[in-house]
From Swiss-Prot:
Pathway: Metabolic intermediate biosynthesis; 1-deoxy-D-xylulose 5-phosphate biosynthesis; 1-deoxy-D-xylulose 5-phosphate from D-glyceraldehyde 3-phosphate and pyruvate: step 1/1. Homodimer. This is 1-deoxy-D-xylulose-5-phosphate synthase. Its cofactor is Mg(2+); thiamine diphosphate. NCBIfam families: dxs, PRK05444.2-2. One of its GO terms (biological process) is 1-deoxy-D-xylulose 5-phosphate biosynthetic process. HAMAP family: DXP_synth. It catalyses: D-glyceraldehyde 3-phosphate + pyruvate + H(+) = 1-deoxy-D-xylulose 5-phosphate + CO2. It comes from Pseudoalteromonas atlantica (strain T6c / ATCC BAA-1087). InterPro entries: Dxylulose-5-P_synthase, THDP-binding, Transketo_C/PFOR_II, Transketolase-like_Pyr-bd, Transketolase_BS, Transketolase_C, Transketolase_CS. Keywords: Isoprene biosynthesis, Magnesium, Metal-binding, Thiamine biosynthesis, Thiamine pyrophosphate, Transferase. The gene is dxs. It comes from the Bacteria. One of its GO terms (molecular function) is thiamine pyrophosphate binding. Mg(2+) binds at D152, N181.
Length: 621
Protein backbone atom coordinates (compact mmCIF):
# COMPACT_ATOMS: atom_id res chain seq x y z
CA UNK A 1 0.00 0.00 0.00
CA UNK A 2 1.41 3.37 -1.09
CA UNK A 3 -0.53 6.58 -0.53
CA UNK A 4 -1.01 8.99 -3.42
CA UNK A 5 1.32 11.92 -2.71
CA UNK A 6 -0.73 14.12 -5.01
CA UNK A 7 -2.95 14.64 -1.97
CA UNK A 8 0.08 15.81 0.03
CA UNK A 9 1.93 18.24 -2.27
CA UNK A 10 4.05 19.94 0.39
CA UNK A 11 4.73 16.78 2.37
CA UNK A 12 5.93 15.21 -0.88
CA UNK A 13 8.69 17.84 -0.93
CA UNK A 14 9.83 16.96 2.59
CA UNK A 15 10.84 13.30 2.58
CA UNK A 16 13.82 14.16 4.80
CA UNK A 17 14.55 16.91 7.34
CA UNK A 18 17.07 18.41 4.93
CA UNK A 19 14.29 18.90 2.39
CA UNK A 20 11.95 20.20 5.09
CA UNK A 21 14.46 22.87 6.08
CA UNK A 22 14.54 24.15 2.50
CA UNK A 23 10.89 25.19 2.74
CA UNK A 24 9.98 28.72 3.86
CA UNK A 25 8.66 28.88 7.40
CA UNK A 26 5.26 30.12 6.29
CA UNK A 27 4.67 26.73 4.62
CA UNK A 28 5.09 24.72 7.82
CA UNK A 29 1.48 25.02 8.90
CA UNK A 30 0.38 23.33 5.68
CA UNK A 31 3.12 20.71 6.03
CA UNK A 32 1.79 19.87 9.48
CA UNK A 33 -1.76 19.63 8.17
CA UNK A 34 -0.73 17.22 5.42
CA UNK A 35 1.47 15.22 7.79
CA UNK A 36 -1.42 14.72 10.20
CA UNK A 37 -3.70 13.58 7.39
CA UNK A 38 -1.02 11.24 6.04
CA UNK A 39 -0.59 9.74 9.50
CA UNK A 40 -4.33 9.26 9.87
CA UNK A 41 -4.67 7.61 6.48
CA UNK A 42 -1.62 5.34 6.75
CA UNK A 43 -2.27 4.08 10.28
CA UNK A 44 -5.97 3.52 9.58
CA UNK A 45 -4.95 1.23 6.72
CA UNK A 46 -2.19 -0.63 8.56
CA UNK A 47 -2.84 -0.36 12.36
CA UNK A 48 -0.41 0.95 14.96
CA UNK A 49 0.10 3.58 17.63
CA UNK A 50 -2.05 6.53 16.71
CA UNK A 51 -3.27 9.18 19.17
CA UNK A 52 0.17 10.13 20.51
CA UNK A 53 1.55 10.80 17.05
CA UNK A 54 -1.40 12.99 16.11
CA UNK A 55 -0.51 15.17 19.07
CA UNK A 56 3.15 15.68 18.14
CA UNK A 57 2.82 16.64 14.48
CA UNK A 58 3.62 20.36 14.84
CA UNK A 59 6.32 19.70 17.43
CA UNK A 60 8.00 17.17 15.14
CA UNK A 61 7.94 19.53 12.17
CA UNK A 62 9.37 22.34 14.29
CA UNK A 63 12.16 20.21 15.76
CA UNK A 64 13.40 18.95 12.42
CA UNK A 65 13.06 22.45 10.93
CA UNK A 66 15.13 24.16 13.62
CA UNK A 67 17.68 21.49 14.49
CA UNK A 68 20.24 20.02 12.14
CA UNK A 69 19.17 16.41 12.53
CA UNK A 70 20.72 13.86 12.51
CA UNK A 71 23.90 15.78 13.45
CA UNK A 72 21.93 17.31 16.30
CA UNK A 73 20.65 14.51 18.51
CA UNK A 74 16.89 14.12 18.90
CA UNK A 75 15.80 11.50 21.46
CA UNK A 76 12.18 10.41 21.73
CA UNK A 77 10.96 8.95 24.99
CA UNK A 78 9.08 5.63 24.62
CA UNK A 79 8.46 6.25 20.92
CA UNK A 80 4.67 6.04 20.64
CA UNK A 81 4.67 9.66 19.50
CA UNK A 82 7.43 9.18 16.92
CA UNK A 83 5.38 8.17 13.87
CA UNK A 84 5.48 11.72 12.41
CA UNK A 85 9.25 11.62 12.98
CA UNK A 86 9.50 8.41 10.97
CA UNK A 87 7.42 9.92 8.15
CA UNK A 88 9.70 12.97 7.93
CA UNK A 89 12.95 10.97 8.04
CA UNK A 90 12.86 8.99 4.81
CA UNK A 91 10.47 6.23 5.87
CA UNK A 92 7.22 7.68 4.63
CA UNK A 93 6.57 5.03 1.98
CA UNK A 94 7.28 2.18 4.41
CA UNK A 95 4.81 3.32 7.07
CA UNK A 96 2.24 0.68 6.03
CA UNK A 97 4.73 -1.99 7.19
CA UNK A 98 5.20 -0.64 10.70
CA UNK A 99 5.02 -3.24 13.50
CA UNK A 100 4.92 -6.05 10.93
CA UNK A 101 7.42 -8.84 10.34
CA UNK A 102 10.38 -7.43 8.37
CA UNK A 103 8.68 -4.02 8.39
CA UNK A 104 9.42 -0.75 10.13
CA UNK A 105 10.30 -1.03 13.78
CA UNK A 106 7.44 0.07 16.09
CA UNK A 107 9.70 2.50 17.96
CA UNK A 108 12.81 4.58 17.17
CA UNK A 109 15.55 2.15 16.20
CA UNK A 110 19.11 3.26 15.29
CA UNK A 111 19.71 0.26 13.03
CA UNK A 112 16.77 1.45 10.93
CA UNK A 113 17.66 5.13 10.59
CA UNK A 114 20.45 7.51 11.53
CA UNK A 115 17.75 9.92 12.68
CA UNK A 116 16.82 7.48 15.46
CA UNK A 117 19.63 8.35 17.81
CA UNK A 118 18.69 6.05 20.69
CA UNK A 119 16.71 2.81 20.87
CA UNK A 120 13.61 3.21 23.01
CA UNK A 121 10.40 1.42 23.91
CA UNK A 122 10.29 1.68 27.70
CA UNK A 123 9.44 5.04 29.20
CA UNK A 124 11.47 7.71 30.96
CA UNK A 125 14.90 6.92 29.52
CA UNK A 126 15.29 9.92 27.21
CA UNK A 127 16.63 12.50 29.66
CA UNK A 128 19.33 10.17 30.99
CA UNK A 129 20.45 9.39 27.44
CA UNK A 130 20.39 13.09 26.58
CA UNK A 131 22.55 14.00 29.57
CA UNK A 132 25.12 11.45 28.45
CA UNK A 133 25.02 12.71 24.87
CA UNK A 134 25.34 16.31 26.05
CA UNK A 135 28.52 15.46 27.96
CA UNK A 136 29.88 13.71 24.87
CA UNK A 137 28.90 16.66 22.67
CA UNK A 138 30.81 19.07 24.88
CA UNK A 139 33.87 16.83 24.69
CA UNK A 140 33.61 16.66 20.88
CA UNK A 141 33.30 20.46 20.68
CA UNK A 142 31.56 20.31 17.29
CA UNK A 143 28.58 22.42 18.30
CA UNK A 144 26.19 19.47 18.40
CA UNK A 145 22.81 20.10 20.07
CA UNK A 146 20.96 17.51 22.15
CA UNK A 147 17.17 17.43 22.57
CA UNK A 148 15.03 14.96 24.52
CA UNK A 149 11.25 14.79 24.09
CA UNK A 150 9.37 13.29 27.03
CA UNK A 151 5.67 13.09 27.83
CA UNK A 152 4.11 14.20 31.08
CA UNK A 153 3.21 10.59 31.86
CA UNK A 154 6.81 9.42 31.45
CA UNK A 155 7.93 12.34 33.60
CA UNK A 156 6.30 10.64 36.61
CA UNK A 157 9.00 7.96 36.68
CA UNK A 158 11.83 8.23 39.16
CA UNK A 159 14.44 7.74 36.45
CA UNK A 160 13.35 10.95 34.74
CA UNK A 161 13.84 12.95 37.92
CA UNK A 162 17.17 11.27 38.61
CA UNK A 163 18.29 12.44 35.18
CA UNK A 164 16.93 15.95 35.75
CA UNK A 165 18.76 16.14 39.04
CA UNK A 166 22.06 15.13 37.44
CA UNK A 167 21.54 17.15 34.26
CA UNK A 168 20.72 20.30 36.17
CA UNK A 169 23.72 19.81 38.43
CA UNK A 170 26.29 19.50 35.64
CA UNK A 171 24.42 22.10 33.51
CA UNK A 172 25.55 20.94 30.07
CA UNK A 173 23.95 22.38 26.95
CA UNK A 174 20.79 20.36 26.37
CA UNK A 175 17.07 20.83 25.90
CA UNK A 176 14.32 18.73 27.44
CA UNK A 177 10.92 19.18 25.84
CA UNK A 178 8.09 18.26 28.17
CA UNK A 179 5.23 17.20 25.91
CA UNK A 180 2.25 17.73 28.19
CA UNK A 181 -0.62 16.05 26.38
CA UNK A 182 -2.89 15.32 29.33
CA UNK A 183 -3.07 18.80 30.90
CA UNK A 184 -1.89 17.08 34.08
CA UNK A 185 0.82 19.59 34.90
CA UNK A 186 -0.74 22.87 33.90
CA UNK A 187 -3.64 24.31 31.96
CA UNK A 188 -2.04 27.74 31.97
CA UNK A 189 -1.72 28.12 28.21
CA UNK A 190 -2.60 31.15 26.18
CA UNK A 191 -1.36 34.20 24.38
CA UNK A 192 0.35 35.65 27.46
CA UNK A 193 2.37 32.50 28.11
CA UNK A 194 3.30 32.08 24.46
CA UNK A 195 4.43 35.71 24.37
CA UNK A 196 6.36 35.27 27.62
CA UNK A 197 8.06 32.13 26.29
CA UNK A 198 9.34 34.01 23.26
CA UNK A 199 10.40 36.91 25.46
CA UNK A 200 12.25 34.73 27.98
CA UNK A 201 14.11 32.86 25.25
CA UNK A 202 15.01 35.96 23.24
CA UNK A 203 18.50 37.40 22.94
CA UNK A 204 17.54 40.63 24.73
CA UNK A 205 16.27 38.96 27.90
CA UNK A 206 19.10 36.43 28.08
CA UNK A 207 21.84 38.96 27.39
CA UNK A 208 20.47 41.15 30.18
CA UNK A 209 20.18 38.17 32.52
CA UNK A 210 23.66 36.80 31.81
CA UNK A 211 25.29 40.21 31.72
CA UNK A 212 23.54 41.30 34.87
CA UNK A 213 24.64 38.19 36.72
CA UNK A 214 28.25 38.83 35.77
CA UNK A 215 28.03 42.52 36.68
CA UNK A 216 26.37 41.91 40.03
CA UNK A 217 28.30 38.78 41.00
CA UNK A 218 30.47 40.86 43.33
CA UNK A 219 27.40 42.37 45.05
CA UNK A 220 25.59 39.35 46.55
CA UNK A 221 22.60 41.22 48.04
CA UNK A 222 21.80 42.93 44.73
CA UNK A 223 22.38 39.70 42.78
CA UNK A 224 19.98 37.88 45.09
CA UNK A 225 17.38 40.63 44.66
CA UNK A 226 17.67 40.48 40.86
CA UNK A 227 17.34 36.70 40.89
CA UNK A 228 14.23 36.90 43.04
CA UNK A 229 12.76 39.55 40.76
CA UNK A 230 13.31 37.31 37.72
CA UNK A 231 11.72 34.37 39.52
CA UNK A 232 8.78 36.52 40.58
CA UNK A 233 8.12 37.73 37.04
CA UNK A 234 8.31 34.20 35.66
CA UNK A 235 6.40 32.70 38.56
CA UNK A 236 3.35 34.83 37.88
CA UNK A 237 2.57 32.72 34.83
CA UNK A 238 5.21 29.95 34.73
CA UNK A 239 4.65 26.74 36.75
CA UNK A 240 8.28 25.64 36.47
CA UNK A 241 9.58 26.01 40.01
CA UNK A 242 10.52 22.35 40.44
CA UNK A 243 12.58 22.37 37.23
CA UNK A 244 14.30 25.62 38.17
CA UNK A 245 15.17 24.12 41.56
CA UNK A 246 16.74 21.15 39.78
CA UNK A 247 18.97 23.51 37.81
CA UNK A 248 17.08 23.79 34.52
CA UNK A 249 16.00 27.03 32.92
CA UNK A 250 12.25 26.56 32.45
CA UNK A 251 10.30 28.07 29.55
CA UNK A 252 6.60 27.65 28.89
CA UNK A 253 4.03 26.37 28.71
CA UNK A 254 3.47 27.10 25.04
CA UNK A 255 0.92 25.87 22.52
CA UNK A 256 2.42 22.80 20.88
CA UNK A 257 0.07 23.06 17.92
CA UNK A 258 1.24 26.54 16.89
CA UNK A 259 4.01 25.33 14.63
CA UNK A 260 5.43 28.79 13.94
CA UNK A 261 5.37 29.70 17.61
CA UNK A 262 7.23 26.51 18.47
CA UNK A 263 9.76 27.20 15.72
CA UNK A 264 10.40 30.73 16.98
CA UNK A 265 10.84 29.53 20.56
CA UNK A 266 13.18 26.70 19.54
CA UNK A 267 15.28 29.07 17.43
CA UNK A 268 15.76 31.28 20.46
CA UNK A 269 16.50 28.35 22.76
CA UNK A 270 19.25 27.06 20.48
CA UNK A 271 21.31 30.04 21.57
CA UNK A 272 20.86 29.60 25.32
CA UNK A 273 23.64 27.83 27.19
CA UNK A 274 23.08 25.22 29.87
CA UNK A 275 20.24 22.88 30.73
CA UNK A 276 16.84 24.00 29.42
CA UNK A 277 13.26 22.74 29.68
CA UNK A 278 10.55 23.76 27.25
CA UNK A 279 7.02 22.92 28.39
CA UNK A 280 4.84 22.27 25.34
CA UNK A 281 1.14 21.56 25.71
CA UNK A 282 -0.42 19.35 23.05
CA UNK A 283 -3.63 17.40 22.65
CA UNK A 284 -3.38 13.64 22.25
CA UNK A 285 -5.36 12.65 19.17
CA UNK A 286 -5.24 16.21 17.78
CA UNK A 287 -7.10 16.64 14.50
CA UNK A 288 -9.23 13.49 14.70
CA UNK A 289 -12.29 14.11 16.84
CA UNK A 290 -12.81 10.53 18.00
CA UNK A 291 -9.20 10.25 19.15
CA UNK A 292 -9.39 13.60 20.93
CA UNK A 293 -12.46 12.43 22.85
CA UNK A 294 -11.01 9.02 23.75
CA UNK A 295 -7.20 9.08 23.45
CA UNK A 296 -6.82 5.91 25.50
CA UNK A 297 -9.01 3.91 23.13
CA UNK A 298 -7.16 5.37 20.14
CA UNK A 299 -3.69 5.00 21.65
CA UNK A 300 -3.10 1.93 19.50
CA UNK A 301 -5.59 0.94 16.85
CA UNK A 302 -6.38 -1.87 14.42
CA UNK A 303 -7.21 -1.09 10.81
CA UNK A 304 -10.24 1.18 10.77
CA UNK A 305 -12.38 3.45 8.62
CA UNK A 306 -11.64 7.10 9.54
CA UNK A 307 -15.11 8.07 8.34
CA UNK A 308 -16.87 5.64 10.67
CA UNK A 309 -18.11 6.59 14.12
CA UNK A 310 -15.61 4.42 15.95
CA UNK A 311 -13.18 1.54 15.77
CA UNK A 312 -14.42 -1.74 14.33
CA UNK A 313 -15.77 -4.22 16.82
CA UNK A 314 -13.38 -7.08 17.38
CA UNK A 315 -14.48 -10.44 16.06
CA UNK A 316 -15.74 -12.78 18.77
CA UNK A 317 -12.84 -14.60 20.35
CA UNK A 318 -11.84 -16.41 23.48
CA UNK A 319 -11.15 -14.19 26.50
CA UNK A 320 -7.62 -12.89 26.72
CA UNK A 321 -5.41 -13.90 29.61
CA UNK A 322 -5.66 -10.28 30.77
CA UNK A 323 -9.45 -10.74 30.87
CA UNK A 324 -9.00 -13.94 32.87
CA UNK A 325 -6.84 -12.08 35.37
CA UNK A 326 -9.30 -9.19 35.64
CA UNK A 327 -12.22 -11.55 36.24
CA UNK A 328 -10.25 -13.46 38.89
CA UNK A 329 -9.28 -10.20 40.58
CA UNK A 330 -12.91 -9.14 40.93
CA UNK A 331 -14.00 -12.58 42.14
CA UNK A 332 -11.18 -12.73 44.66
CA UNK A 333 -11.83 -9.23 45.98
CA UNK A 334 -15.41 -10.20 46.77
CA UNK A 335 -14.01 -12.85 49.10
CA UNK A 336 -10.98 -10.98 50.39
CA UNK A 337 -11.30 -7.36 51.55
CA UNK A 338 -7.54 -7.36 52.20
CA UNK A 339 -6.70 -7.93 48.54
CA UNK A 340 -4.81 -4.89 47.24
CA UNK A 341 -4.06 -4.66 43.51
CA UNK A 342 -1.21 -2.52 42.21
CA UNK A 343 -0.39 -1.49 38.65
CA UNK A 344 2.29 0.84 37.23
CA UNK A 345 0.04 2.76 34.82
CA UNK A 346 -1.24 -0.29 32.92
CA UNK A 347 -4.88 -0.46 34.03
CA UNK A 348 -6.40 -1.08 30.62
CA UNK A 349 -3.68 -3.36 29.29
CA UNK A 350 -3.68 -5.53 32.40
CA UNK A 351 -7.45 -6.01 32.41
CA UNK A 352 -8.11 -4.02 35.58
CA UNK A 353 -10.74 -1.51 34.47
CA UNK A 354 -13.71 -3.35 36.00
CA UNK A 355 -11.81 -4.00 39.22
CA UNK A 356 -10.79 -0.35 39.54
CA UNK A 357 -14.43 0.69 39.22
CA UNK A 358 -15.91 -1.92 41.55
CA UNK A 359 -13.18 -1.89 44.20
CA UNK A 360 -11.60 1.60 44.08
CA UNK A 361 -10.36 1.38 47.68
CA UNK A 362 -8.40 -1.76 46.82
CA UNK A 363 -6.94 -0.47 43.56
CA UNK A 364 -3.69 1.49 43.25
CA UNK A 365 -2.28 2.91 40.02
CA UNK A 366 1.15 4.20 41.05
CA UNK A 367 1.94 5.68 37.60
CA UNK A 368 5.06 4.72 35.65
CA UNK A 369 6.95 3.68 38.75
CA UNK A 370 7.74 -0.02 38.67
CA UNK A 371 10.30 0.14 41.47
CA UNK A 372 7.86 1.92 43.75
CA UNK A 373 5.05 -0.45 42.76
CA UNK A 374 6.96 -3.51 43.98
CA UNK A 375 8.18 -2.00 47.25
CA UNK A 376 4.78 -0.41 47.87
CA UNK A 377 3.31 -3.91 47.53
CA UNK A 378 5.96 -5.20 49.91
CA UNK A 379 4.88 -2.60 52.45
CA UNK A 380 1.27 -3.68 52.07
CA UNK A 381 2.23 -7.33 52.54
CA UNK A 382 4.37 -6.58 55.58
CA UNK A 383 1.29 -5.16 57.28
CA UNK A 384 -0.95 -8.10 56.51
CA UNK A 385 -2.53 -7.01 53.23
CA UNK A 386 -2.68 -9.44 50.30
CA UNK A 387 -0.82 -7.58 47.57
CA UNK A 388 -1.12 -8.38 43.88
CA UNK A 389 1.18 -6.61 41.42
CA UNK A 390 -0.13 -6.68 37.85
CA UNK A 391 2.79 -5.93 35.58
CA UNK A 392 4.08 -6.70 32.11
CA UNK A 393 7.04 -9.06 31.96
CA UNK A 394 9.20 -6.50 30.18
CA UNK A 395 8.46 -3.84 32.83
CA UNK A 396 9.14 -6.13 35.80
CA UNK A 397 12.78 -5.98 34.67
CA UNK A 398 12.83 -2.39 35.90
CA UNK A 399 12.12 -3.43 39.50
CA UNK A 400 14.55 -6.30 39.88
CA UNK A 401 16.35 -5.04 42.98
CA UNK A 402 13.04 -4.38 44.69
CA UNK A 403 11.89 -7.88 43.77
CA UNK A 404 14.92 -9.38 45.50
CA UNK A 405 15.66 -6.95 48.32
CA UNK A 406 12.19 -5.83 49.36
CA UNK A 407 10.01 -8.87 48.61
CA UNK A 408 11.95 -12.13 48.36
CA UNK A 409 14.54 -11.39 51.04
CA UNK A 410 11.76 -10.88 53.56
CA UNK A 411 9.73 -13.76 52.07
CA UNK A 412 6.70 -11.50 51.77
CA UNK A 413 3.47 -12.84 50.25
CA UNK A 414 3.29 -10.69 47.13
CA UNK A 415 1.68 -12.19 44.03
CA UNK A 416 3.08 -11.05 40.69
CA UNK A 417 0.58 -11.37 37.83
CA UNK A 418 3.02 -11.18 34.93
CA UNK A 419 1.23 -10.25 31.71
CA UNK A 420 2.78 -10.23 28.21
CA UNK A 421 5.11 -13.13 29.02
CA UNK A 422 6.73 -14.70 25.97
CA UNK A 423 6.46 -13.09 22.54
CA UNK A 424 4.18 -10.07 22.40
CA UNK A 425 4.04 -9.65 18.63
CA UNK A 426 3.98 -6.24 17.00
CA UNK A 427 5.75 -4.25 19.74
CA UNK A 428 9.00 -6.07 19.05
CA UNK A 429 12.24 -6.51 21.01
CA UNK A 430 11.70 -3.81 23.62
CA UNK A 431 8.51 -5.52 24.81
CA UNK A 432 9.10 -9.25 24.40
CA UNK A 433 8.58 -11.06 27.70
CA UNK A 434 11.64 -13.24 27.27
CA UNK A 435 13.56 -12.91 30.50
CA UNK A 436 11.20 -13.29 33.46
CA UNK A 437 11.78 -17.01 34.07
CA UNK A 438 15.59 -16.70 34.09
CA UNK A 439 15.64 -13.66 36.37
CA UNK A 440 12.97 -15.04 38.71
CA UNK A 441 14.30 -18.59 38.90
CA UNK A 442 17.50 -17.61 40.67
CA UNK A 443 15.70 -15.74 43.47
CA UNK A 444 15.24 -17.68 46.73
CA UNK A 445 11.70 -18.05 48.13
CA UNK A 446 10.09 -17.46 44.73
CA UNK A 447 7.41 -19.79 43.33
CA UNK A 448 7.00 -19.59 39.53
CA UNK A 449 3.92 -20.90 37.73
CA UNK A 450 3.35 -21.26 33.99
CA UNK A 451 -0.31 -21.89 33.09
CA UNK A 452 -1.02 -23.78 29.90
CA UNK A 453 -4.58 -22.51 29.52
CA UNK A 454 -7.20 -20.14 30.92
CA UNK A 455 -8.39 -22.39 33.73
CA UNK A 456 -4.88 -23.13 34.92
CA UNK A 457 -4.20 -19.40 34.92
CA UNK A 458 -7.19 -18.75 37.16
CA UNK A 459 -6.33 -21.58 39.53
CA UNK A 460 -2.67 -20.55 39.69
CA UNK A 461 -3.60 -16.96 40.52
CA UNK A 462 -5.70 -18.32 43.37
CA UNK A 463 -2.85 -20.62 44.42
CA UNK A 464 -0.37 -17.76 44.49
CA UNK A 465 -2.78 -15.53 46.37
CA UNK A 466 -3.22 -18.14 49.08
CA UNK A 467 0.49 -18.93 49.26
CA UNK A 468 2.26 -17.25 52.15
CA UNK A 469 5.37 -16.33 50.16
CA UNK A 470 6.38 -14.58 46.91
CA UNK A 471 4.77 -16.09 43.83
CA UNK A 472 4.59 -15.33 40.12
CA UNK A 473 2.08 -16.41 37.49
CA UNK A 474 3.21 -15.62 33.95
CA UNK A 475 0.84 -15.55 30.99
CA UNK A 476 0.97 -14.23 27.43
CA UNK A 477 -0.62 -11.44 25.48
CA UNK A 478 -3.79 -12.30 23.63
CA UNK A 479 -6.47 -14.95 23.70
CA UNK A 480 -6.18 -18.31 25.35
CA UNK A 481 -6.75 -21.78 23.99
CA UNK A 482 -10.51 -21.92 24.46
CA UNK A 483 -10.54 -23.70 27.80
CA UNK A 484 -13.36 -22.30 29.94
CA UNK A 485 -12.22 -21.38 33.45
CA UNK A 486 -13.98 -23.03 36.37
CA UNK A 487 -15.97 -20.63 38.50
CA UNK A 488 -14.73 -22.42 41.59
CA UNK A 489 -11.16 -21.82 42.65
CA UNK A 490 -8.88 -24.45 44.10
CA UNK A 491 -5.26 -24.24 45.18
CA UNK A 492 -2.92 -26.46 43.20
CA UNK A 493 -0.36 -28.71 44.82
CA UNK A 494 2.90 -26.78 44.73
CA UNK A 495 5.54 -28.18 42.41
CA UNK A 496 3.38 -30.86 40.83
CA UNK A 497 2.85 -31.41 37.10
CA UNK A 498 0.18 -33.33 35.17
CA UNK A 499 0.56 -35.86 32.39
CA UNK A 500 -1.32 -34.96 29.21
CA UNK A 501 -0.30 -37.82 26.94
CA UNK A 502 1.65 -41.04 27.30
CA UNK A 503 4.06 -41.96 24.53
CA UNK A 504 7.40 -43.65 23.87
CA UNK A 505 11.04 -42.65 23.44
CA UNK A 506 10.36 -38.89 23.40
CA UNK A 507 8.89 -36.82 26.23
CA UNK A 508 7.94 -33.15 25.91
CA UNK A 509 8.08 -31.20 29.16
CA UNK A 510 5.91 -28.17 28.47
CA UNK A 511 6.05 -24.94 30.47
CA UNK A 512 3.18 -22.60 29.62
CA UNK A 513 0.89 -21.82 26.72
CA UNK A 514 2.77 -23.63 23.96
CA UNK A 515 1.02 -26.83 25.05
CA UNK A 516 -1.15 -27.04 21.87
CA UNK A 517 2.06 -27.08 19.79
CA UNK A 518 3.46 -29.79 22.05
CA UNK A 519 0.33 -31.92 21.68
CA UNK A 520 0.34 -31.64 17.88
CA UNK A 521 4.02 -32.53 17.72
CA UNK A 522 3.46 -35.44 20.09
CA UNK A 523 0.95 -37.00 17.71
CA UNK A 524 3.66 -37.23 15.06
CA UNK A 525 6.48 -38.18 17.43
CA UNK A 526 4.33 -40.47 19.60
CA UNK A 527 5.70 -38.50 22.52
CA UNK A 528 4.74 -38.25 26.14
CA UNK A 529 3.54 -34.76 27.07
CA UNK A 530 3.84 -33.34 30.57
CA UNK A 531 2.28 -30.02 31.56
CA UNK A 532 4.95 -29.04 34.08
CA UNK A 533 2.98 -26.12 35.57
CA UNK A 534 5.76 -25.08 37.96
CA UNK A 535 9.21 -23.86 37.00
CA UNK A 536 10.08 -23.46 40.66
CA UNK A 537 9.84 -25.69 42.57
CA UNK A 538 10.43 -28.08 39.70
CA UNK A 539 8.60 -31.40 39.71
CA UNK A 540 11.80 -33.43 39.85
CA UNK A 541 9.87 -36.63 40.46
CA UNK A 542 8.13 -36.26 37.10
CA UNK A 543 11.41 -35.41 35.38
CA UNK A 544 13.09 -38.44 36.92
CA UNK A 545 10.28 -40.75 35.84
CA UNK A 546 10.29 -39.68 32.19
CA UNK A 547 14.09 -39.67 32.12
CA UNK A 548 14.08 -43.37 33.05
CA UNK A 549 11.75 -44.38 30.24
CA UNK A 550 12.53 -42.04 27.34
CA UNK A 551 15.54 -41.55 25.10
CA UNK A 552 14.96 -37.85 24.53
CA UNK A 553 13.49 -35.17 26.77
CA UNK A 554 12.36 -31.94 25.10
CA UNK A 555 11.68 -28.87 27.20
CA UNK A 556 9.37 -26.31 25.62
CA UNK A 557 8.94 -22.78 26.96
CA UNK A 558 8.00 -19.33 25.61
CA UNK A 559 10.96 -17.62 27.23
CA UNK A 560 14.73 -17.45 27.00
CA UNK A 561 16.39 -20.85 27.13
CA UNK A 562 19.47 -19.36 28.78
CA UNK A 563 18.69 -19.77 32.45
CA UNK A 564 15.11 -20.74 31.68
CA UNK A 565 12.87 -23.65 32.62
CA UNK A 566 14.81 -25.99 30.38
CA UNK A 567 17.90 -24.97 32.27
CA UNK A 568 16.24 -26.06 35.51
CA UNK A 569 15.60 -29.50 34.01
CA UNK A 570 19.18 -29.69 32.72
CA UNK A 571 20.58 -28.78 36.13
CA UNK A 572 18.53 -31.50 37.77
CA UNK A 573 19.56 -34.15 35.25
CA UNK A 574 23.22 -33.22 35.65
CA UNK A 575 22.92 -33.67 39.40
CA UNK A 576 21.60 -37.22 38.99
CA UNK A 577 22.65 -40.40 37.19
CA UNK A 578 20.04 -40.08 34.45
CA UNK A 579 21.47 -40.41 30.95
CA UNK A 580 18.56 -39.21 28.82
CA UNK A 581 19.41 -36.70 26.14
CA UNK A 582 17.92 -33.23 26.50
CA UNK A 583 16.76 -30.80 23.82
CA UNK A 584 15.80 -27.32 25.03
CA UNK A 585 13.37 -25.39 22.83
CA UNK A 586 12.60 -21.78 23.60
CA UNK A 587 13.65 -18.27 22.68
CA UNK A 588 17.26 -18.12 21.42
CA UNK A 589 20.00 -15.91 22.81
CA UNK A 590 19.03 -12.89 20.73
CA UNK A 591 16.47 -10.10 20.72
CA UNK A 592 13.37 -11.12 18.77
CA UNK A 593 12.01 -8.55 16.33
CA UNK A 594 8.39 -7.65 15.66
CA UNK A 595 5.88 -9.87 13.90
CA UNK A 596 2.80 -11.79 14.92
CA UNK A 597 3.26 -14.39 17.63
CA UNK A 598 2.41 -17.15 15.15
CA UNK A 599 4.94 -15.85 12.61
CA UNK A 600 7.75 -15.55 15.11
CA UNK A 601 7.18 -18.91 16.82
CA UNK A 602 7.27 -20.54 13.39
CA UNK A 603 10.44 -18.68 12.40
CA UNK A 604 12.21 -19.67 15.61
CA UNK A 605 11.03 -23.27 15.36
CA UNK A 606 8.84 -23.30 18.46
CA UNK A 607 5.60 -24.37 16.78
CA UNK A 608 4.64 -28.01 16.20
CA UNK A 609 6.49 -28.19 12.87
CA UNK A 610 9.60 -26.75 14.48
CA UNK A 611 9.44 -29.14 17.42
CA UNK A 612 9.09 -32.13 15.09
CA UNK A 613 11.97 -31.01 12.86
CA UNK A 614 14.29 -30.34 15.80
CA UNK A 615 13.42 -33.65 17.43
CA UNK A 616 14.15 -35.62 14.24
CA UNK A 617 17.44 -33.77 13.74
CA UNK A 618 18.46 -34.35 17.35
CA UNK A 619 17.57 -38.05 17.29
CA UNK A 620 19.52 -38.53 14.05
CA UNK A 621 22.75 -37.26 15.61
Amino acid sequence: MTLDLAHYPLLALADTPEQLRELPQDKLKQVAKELRQYLLTSVSQSSGHFASGLGTVELTVALHYVYNTPFDRLIWDVGHQAYPHKILTGRRDRMPTIRQKNGLHPFPWPNESEYDTFAVGHSSTSISAAVGMAVAAEKEALGRKVVAVIGDGAMTAGMAFEALNHGGDIDKDMLVILNDNEMSISENVGALNSHLARLLTGNFFNSIRDGGKKLLSSVPPIKEFASRAEEHIKGMVVPGTIFEELGFNYIGPIDGHDVNGVVDTLKNMRNIKGAQILHVVTKKGKGYELAEKDPIKFHAVPKFNPSADGLPKAAPSDPTFSNIFGRWLCDMAQQDPNLMAVTPAMREGSGMVEFSQKFPAQYFDVAIAEQHAVTFAAGLAKEGQNAVVAIYSTFLQRAYDQLIHDVALQNLPVLFAIDRAGLVGADGPTHQGAFDIPFLRCIPNMVIMTPADENECRQMLYTGHKLNKPAAVRYPRGSGTGVKPDNTMQALEIGKSRTIRQGEKVAILNFGVLLPYAEKAAEVLNATVIDMRFVKPLDTEAVANVAKNHELLITLEDGATTGGAGGAVAEYLLSTVHTSRLLQIGLPDEFIMQGTQTEMYAEIGMDDAGIIAKAHTFLAQ
